[in-house]
Structure formats: structure tokens, C-alpha cells
Amino acid sequence: MEIYIFLYSSRFNTSGRFYFAGVHNIIPLHGKGIASSNDFDLNKYDLIVARKRNYYVTNIKNHYCRAHSEGDLNILRSIVEAMYPDYNQAFDTVMHGRKISLYNMFVGKADVVNQYCQWLFPLLDEVNKQIDFSGYDSYQKRILGFMAERLFNVWIEHNKRNIKVGYRKVVNIEGENLIKKGSALLVRHFLK
């Protein structure tokens, strides 16, 4: 069995196929290459994830702290340390690195996805109990999702010897203003 997890506006890209496989039909999406279930080879990979984004001017930890609460990230780190101390090295490797798979989206073998979910959700549940969301706007209230993106990479880093991971390009079906995103990143990094 295969399990597919996708963000609401992002899909995996494919080369050569330009459709989104709907429940009963094929929906053209203005020439964007949207992968369908036939485009994923889980005989070759255990997990297929978004191609890593490279943060050239900062590392993953600093990027997170400039956009969100450093205190919340410290809470997350302490929870990982308490619940899964064997993941500490992977956590630090990801946070001090410059590449990350984003979007909380993947296609994977059911047993691998189950292992990940059994690890992830107790962590997020504990984080949810310890963080005070009362002063957060609607964007910052999404921090569990932002943390899950980082934790996904931590889980992969820790398990990389036991699973085969494939990487795919992602297309945002709503469009993505990369100049605006890049400018905001630079402002947060250099002016905050």
C-alpha cells in the first residue's frame, strides 16, 4: 500500500506528463507538470519527498528563528532530547545545515510512513502542550506545521541508512513569487 501526503497548494512535478489525476477525470492545469500516482516508483524508493531547498545565506535553525520564535524551537529541541535522545545528532545536523525538504509532502510505503507518524505525532502533541499560542497571529499559529517540516528532515537524517529516499521537484499550483520570497528571506536575515 502507498500513502500520499500533500500540502494544499503544492504537488510533485513530473517531466512529460501535464495533468492532475482527479478522482474521476483528468484536470489540465495550464501546462504545469503535476505528478500522478503512476509517476512514483516505490519499488526503487521507500519514500519520495520534495527536492531540498538550499538556503545560501543562512542555516535551517537561523532561518526558522528569524521567521518564528526561537524559544519555541528550543522547546522542540528539548522535547526531542527527552523523548527520542537518539535523534539529537540528526536534529543538530539538520538545524545547522543549509538544505531542507519543505512542504510536509511525501509519497511512501505504508510501513515507512507509519514509522514516521508514530515518531512525529507524539512529539507534536507534546510541543502543542508546552507552547503558548495566545499571542500568535494566524500565520504563527501554524508553527506545528513549520516544525513538522523540520522534524521530517530530522527523521530522514536519522533513518537514512535504513530507507531509500527519492527527491522530486515541486510545483505550486497557485504560483509562487520567488522574488518576493527571496526578498523577504534577505530582509529577515539581514535586517531583523
What are these model-derived regions, one by one?
Residues 1-192:
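ER/Golgi luminal nucleotide-sugar-dependent glycosyltransferases, focusing on the catalytic module
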